[in-house]
Amino acid sequence: MNKVNKVNYIIEELENLFPKVPVPLNHKDPYTLLIAVLLSAQCTDERVNQITPILFKKADNPYDMIKLSVEEIKEIIKPCGLSPMKSKGIYGLSKIIIEKHNGYVPKTFEHLEELPAVGHKTASVVMSQAFGIPAFPVDTHIHRLMYRWGLSNGSSVVQTEKDAKRLFPEKKWNKLHLQIIYYARKYSPARGWNIDNDIICLLYTSDAADDLRC
């Protein structure tokens, strides 16, 4: 199976397995998605979804958020980890969104990545899932599977993103990155991985073992 056929097979299999892929983080608009994604750094989606209702009950927009102190935000989000850094980031980005963007989350990578505590991955999630702009956020699951499938060399998430964008059609990026995450969690985890449960790798081992790292 050459790389083109492999990519086409992955796309088809993921579409069969996960025709609908909701964003795992609960949110209602670009701002609440931005905050949820920021909180998800080194924290499970499940934990984030437990914390955001508490936070958003007090402040679900930048204007209400800056009425809270950094310390108040920190106490609410403490179960998510990294609360000192995240609370300063949430307060700081809320202030900038008000002062520079009229209270709206900006719609460009440049302006998103200027916000405190917002890196390229967070910006990519917001661009793709809040605004529908093609992006390919790479988290640990996508980084692992791109390497495991022999589609990237695993050298860095930057390289993995470049390879994903080069190999997969742009019109599929926004859905596909979520499908890969869902697949990774269910069939191809980092720990306790069993090839007998890994549908995609199972096909490769009999067909394309030379460029597979399963």
Please state what every model-predicted region is:
Residues 2-206:
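Catalytic cores of DNA base-excision repair glycosylases
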Residues 204-214:
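Single conserved hydrophobic/aromatic residue that forms the stacking wall/gate
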